[in-house]
Amino acid sequence: MSEMTPPQIVSELDKFIIGQEKAKRAVSIALRNRWRRMQLNSELRYEVTPKNILMIGPTGVGKTEIARRLAKLADSPFIKVEATKFTEVGYVGKEVDSIIRDLTDAAIKMIRIKNIKKNKVRVEEIVEEKILDVLVPTPKKNWTESEKNESLAKTIQTFRKKLREGVLDEKEIEINILSTTMGVEIMAPPGMEELTNQLQSLFQNLGGHKKSSRRLKIKDAIVLLTEEEAAKLINQEEIKKEAINAVEQNGIVFIDEIDKICRRGDSSGPDISREGVQRDLLPLVEGCTVSTKHGMVKTDHILFIASGAFQTSTPSDLIPELQGRLPIKVELQALTIDDFEKILTEPTASITAQYKALMETEGVYINFTKEGIRNIAEAAWKVNESIENIGARRLHTVLEKLMEDISFNASDNKGNTIEINSNYVEEHLDQLTSNEDLGRFIL
């Protein structure tokens, strides 16, 4: 797992997310506490449970982006789910237990990739030798032993050099590789994904592990042989054991749109997609044991981070038991014009940098002036205020409208530099921001 300190985590998040310091601090402390807990003795470690987080804020302010970036920093099993996809146990739809099954599958994949990387050098050596065995002919029988060895060594070195330089990539060779059985696609109702996976595994294993001779280009043969040899060096049972332990000790679940499963005060009758889902989530968040195809997984020490806009409801509309299991509540602020301006320029791979790079592929060079950036930010903020506040996502809509003519006529402007200044922005966005009805239609 990641050993980054809270300031380091916040610093990394700052590269992609503008503002929202409280939320960044909360998730960075929670992530660091995962590492701190692992340094304790086993008896005390069991008693220390994670403090789950509820992030509250309007749409488009960075809740989901924080989770997405946190997943890359965590180096721990991580899964993001939408609360609206689940229904109460006994009804058609995904059950909440599938969250832990999916998290375990993600952990298996993560541990498997780590093991493959660990064995990368060894696998490359084995694959190289197998390719050379096919490429290098056997010396003639009437040669002396020393002549054979000398000739063989020279030939092998020659081919090894060419192979490493990629000179032989297009050359075709005949090799024996494991034959893959025909894939079987099984359609199943929601909530029966586990059974579907088991049936697919059964059909895939029916063909056994037979080898077949295939004629392939060397570059394609290397890919197939690498997969085959990497699989041989992996102990599947050890991976399962390690993955389950990683999930139980360091797993992180991000539940988005949790406000959509709040039961409104004026509703009546059974509510299978709201309060029932909350009650099903309780055992997971509090700690229970879930059965997966890889083994039993305990959820006692999994960190849950929930988020929601709560525009038509409030956190108090969640059932009290669930509120109590999300003790850390962080409010994210609505974005200002200054925030929009920073979002356009400061993050790594900012929106403006993306548009510049896209246009440069056609030889068109875009230059955004400081005044132009400010005008774009003001336009996005104005549309948000007058129509519907969708946060930073509005910038994509505004910039797409602004760049429409340039994108359409890019091939005619090859070699030109186009400056997007205050006048250009006003000319192309003035009608959009001044006419509310037109704005509603376009956006």
Curated annotation (Swiss-Prot):
Its main location: cytoplasm. GO terms for biological process: protein unfolding; proteolysis involved in protein catabolic process. One of its GO terms (cellular component) is HslUV protease complex. It is found in: Cytoplasm. Keywords: ATP-binding, Chaperone, Cytoplasm, Nucleotide-binding. NCBIfam families: hslU, PRK05201.1. A double ring-shaped homohexamer of HslV is capped on each side by a ring-shaped HslU homohexamer. The assembly of the HslU/HslV complex is dependent on binding of ATP. Belongs to the ClpX chaperone family. HslU subfamily. HAMAP family: HslU. This is ATP-dependent protease ATPase subunit HslU. It comes from Buchnera aphidicola subsp. Acyrthosiphon pisum (strain APS). The gene is hslU.
